[in-house]
Amino acid sequence: MLVETKAKVGVFAIALGAYLPQFPTLVPEFETQYDAFKKTIPDTVEMIDGGIVTTKELSMEAGDKFRAADEDLVILQLLTYATSYNMLPAVRDLNVPVVLVNVQKRKAPDYANTDTPKWLGELYACGAVGEMVADLERAGKRHAVITGVVEGGDAYVAKEIDEWCRAAQVRRRFRYTNIAQIGRPYPGMMDLYIDETNLYNRMGLYTKQFDWEKIWAIADPVTDEAAIRAKAEEILDTFDIEGGATVETVWDMAKYVVAFEEWVKKEDLGMVASHYDCLLYTSPSPRDRSVS
């Protein structure tokens, strides 16, 4: 079964600390923008708040918090120009994608009433994009840029953030999901074999191996006739069986399905793959067949 757990998404914003003593109005401006930005993160994920980073030290603190949270994704709001030291210490030790959100507050300047603080606080989110992308490239970090505007709303930005959070959710689920492989490929079918190491390293998926002898036997201890009957009725309601069928004719099948569903829960499986097994059985039951 797929694990219902929330992805952990690190969120922080960056701005050059040297601007703040020169233009004190930037502090409440950036705080307001960052608070509004955090509300765009869907509640389907758990947000790890790294705060507004204006120095290397604050960036290191954010990085410590992100590592401790074992997060799946980092989303970074660019408030204005910032240096590499505002970002890299926060993400250096993380092996997750970094999404730069280059979202400007205003669509266009009001030139007659725009001064330096207005420019830096409302119109210069793009100032650090090139530098941050270059840093992430050199550091070998996976990254993406979302560009848009706050004024008037921007459906594209909201959609992109939501899709990244959905991807993080998939990653988190995979990390706690097991795959079952039952049986073995027919000799010579080399394309069916998987690289378990690669699958685990890239997606966090752990593979459990089972043989068909064990799988057929899981139905042997099932004695709950009420559960079997309910499953048989479900089978009859779900499938159009040619020639007709009754609870009695699908009883063995229903018994096995009950056992199989319990086995999936017990082994904590999200996916099950099966293939050829050459074993033949002689007892008069669903085991009396080769499986492919």
Regions found by a protein language model. Name each.
Residues 2-130, 141, 147-163, 168, ...:
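Metallocofactor- and cofactor-centric catalytic cores in central/energy metabolism, strongly enriched
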Residues 6-8, 176, 286:
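A structure-centric signal for secondary-structure junctions around beta-strands
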Residues 133-138:
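Active-site-proximal region of nucleotide-activated glycan assembly enzymes
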Residues 166-190:
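Conserved anion/nucleotide-ligand pocket segment
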Residues 184, 274-277:
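Short, well-ordered beta-to-alpha junction loops that form the rim of enzyme active sites
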Residues 262, 276-279:
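C-terminal appended segment following the main domain
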Residues 281-288:
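Conserved small/polar residues in nucleotide/adenosyl-binding loops
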